[in-house]
Amino acid sequence: MKITFVGEAVSGFGGMETVISNVIHTFENSSPKINCEMFFFCRNDKMDKAWLKEIKYAQSFSNIKLSFLRRAKHVYNFSQWLKETSPDIVICIDVISCLYANKARKKSGKQFTIFSWPHFSLDHKKHAECITYADYHLAISSGIKEQMMARGISAQNISVVYNPVSIKTIIVPSPERDKPAVFLYVGRLKFEGQKRVKDLFDGLARTTGEWQLHIIGDGSDFEKCQAYSREL
């Protein structure tokens, strides 16, 4: 079975890359009959590719400013690639790729099943309506499943799969009674939107007892988050 993961270029340093890489390696290690590849729609060649070291991938490049022409080039390039590779399943890691995959399938004349596998809330994503171009859907939370259904997708075509995690035997001990509780946040600093660091601050502000919050990360809302934390 050939499985292709498609999507717009990512940074190469995020959690989504880790999840996708783990899933691909799990698939391929579980059966020699499963072959996975990736296909990216790119505007430039800035994506860090260290995470793709053991993953076969291809890219379509287009920096055309007019969106409909840029999309047309990506669809054409992907359709040509589909003719050569003939995947059985295409899994779209973002919403716009559902549109690309659907149009490329028609253009290539190939038959395969399209799954959407969005890693972000649909309520905060541009082109969220494009998710309806997929045949079936993988939701990483019950909330995203509800967002899919709100866009007219049947619950029968949605599977809630959550995010894969590695099993650890290490247990983080509870804080000692005379020591403050220590919380750790690792990730992008988005005040609201996808990450909603504001909710973390609001929740901790209502917490009784001594505690500490350590934050590792950066983002466009760094100063906003910092200022809000001082107000509480």
Regions found by a protein language model. Name each.
Residues 71, 92-98, 118:
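Short His-centered aromatic/hydrophobic patch
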Residues 79-80, 120-137, 151:
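Membrane-proximal helix-turn-helix segments that form the acceptor-binding/catalytic region
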Residues 143, 164:
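Carbohydrate-associated surface elements
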